[in-house]
Amino acid sequence: MDRRRFIKGSMAMAAVCGTSGIASLFSQAAFAADSDIADGQTQRFDFSILQSMAHDLAQTAWRGAPRPLPDTLATMTPQAYNSIQYDAEKSLWHNVENRQLDAQFFHMGMGFRRRVRMFSVDPATHLAREIHFRPELFKYNDAGVDTKQLEGQSDLGFAGFRVFKAPELARRDVVSFLGASYFRAVDDTYQYGLSARGLAIDTYTDSKEEFPDFTAFWFDTVKPGATTFTVYALLDSASITGAYKFTIHCEKNQVIMDVENHLYARKDIKQLGIAPMTSMFSCGTNERRMCDTIHPQIHDSDRLSMWRGNGEWICRPLNNPQKLQFNAYTDNNPKGFGLLQLDRDFSHYQDIMGWYNKRPSLWVEPRNKWGKGTIGLMEIPTTGETLDNIVCFWQPEKAVKAGDEFAFQYRLYWSAQPPVHCPLARVMATRTGMGGFPEGWAPGEHYPEKWARRFAVDFVGGDLKAAAPKGIEPVITLSSGEAKQIEILYIEPIDGYRIQFDWYPTSDSTDPVDMRMYLRCQGDAISETWLYQYFPPAPDKRQYVDDRVMS
């Protein structure tokens, strides 16, 4: 949890086994034209070489924790770290004619202690040269860094990188890789939100969670006028190594990443998380427990959406539970899943600092057969917006043993809306509140005699209008308790239907209640499936208290 909190805070305000090559005057001159900042010797590089490097690295012992930073960097505050700026005149692709993309590097410091090596690659000759750290690549401003401590530290490395797109080539980045294997991207709002990771290990097991690191990146020199770039990454951790290829399309309204990885297990792994993503949900329309601020909602994402291998669409609203929860949803060759932020209305957040209405959704689209497994969702209690408390990933069914090799291909969409939608009626919003009284009498002069919890789920789209005259039937399944006072209400402002029901307990149990609902018309499903997890209060809390003072 400490690592997750640190990454969140830092983002708001990272030893490679080399492959030797023979340098030539021709290759040195070629690189000078493309990347003045690359100063290392040339070496052969392509994705197959990186795969061999990752494979061989897995046969050796993990090198352990990173070495200590110079004192001037290790003791930095977040404010000081954020004041360090990369010199835009020394950017990676600064000399590329008609460049539409450019890359800059993050400085080491604060909690970013793992050295990340950077290489520039000529894609025509498959020759790479390292870019070594040197203080003149940065502007230290008022960070208070003693640059004398950095002299001669060419092997210090960098913490990560970020990419800019024209016309904001040096001002507003669209892609960022920083910290462990975390990375993010934006849509056309330029507002960062949730994060992805290269890999998740033992997120919810009896072992300590492991955070693999990207320890080196190789950048193909971008073509003139191109808005797509390719970067390769070496992943390393105590349990596994990996070779990654990211082909990143920086489009007008979204960023799309084609990801290919080859993984090599060093040791047995209890829980391997593929295409993991990390987000934040503090409070929303369905969960008001932590909403005692001026903001009606606070979240990076409001739901987990799943398109199952059998074609079923599922909407699972997120929670901020009082106790950590982990749910696993079984599937076979999933078609896609993601953490979505679909409510883009500023008035629903009233936040001019976080701008949650501008934050992107993230959708994962598998590109090869993933087989059997589960989509894991972990929800961690949080008291505010500074902790990423939502984790989601694909876990293969097959147990991971030392020496196993895996290959996954998938596409990531960072956009306001996912690239695909359920063709049936979709869940627009979920609301919860006091139950046990007729709608329109909330709750009347006297509180209800019997305690209940009300749920209201709004559906829009699909064939709802055509189905209405024939009869819409909510199909509700509960793991415990009873659903009563079920109503179907037409909501004109959204041109959709609200399914409303009251949940009544049938025992004193406080175990989570799993709820499932979909809409049916004449025997056929006409909506995606709504899943929800409700946490009943203790029996002595199941009462209404009238705290009015009348005299």
Swiss-Prot record:
UniProt keywords, alphabetically: Periplasm, Signal
Modifications after synthesis and translation: Predicted to be exported by the Tat system. The position of the signal peptide cleavage has not been experimentally proven.
Subcellular location: Periplasm
Any Gene Ontology CC annotation: outer membrane-bounded periplasmic space
A molecular function GO annotation: catalytic activity
InterPro entries: Gal_mutarotase_sf_dom (IPR011013), GH-type_carb-bd (IPR014718), Glucan_biosyn_MdoD (IPR023724), Glucan_biosyn_MdoG/MdoD (IPR014438), Glucan_biosyn_MdoG_C (IPR007444), Ig-like_fold (IPR013783), Ig_E-set (IPR014756), TAT_signal (IPR006311)
Chief place where the protein resides: periplasm
Keyword Phosphoprotein: no
Any GO BP: beta-glucan biosynthetic process
Signal peptide region: 1-32
Entry annotated with the keyword Signal: yes
Pathway(s) annotated for this protein in UniProt: Glycan metabolism; osmoregulated periplasmic glucan (OPG) biosynthesis
Gene3D superfamilies for the chain: 2.70.98.10, Immunoglobulins
Protein role: Probably involved in the control of the structural glucose backbone of osmoregulated periplasmic glucans (OPGs).
Recorded family membership: Belongs to the OpgD/OpgG family.
Name used for this protein in its record: Glucans biosynthesis protein D
Protein's organism: Escherichia coli O1:K1 / APEC
Gene: mdoD
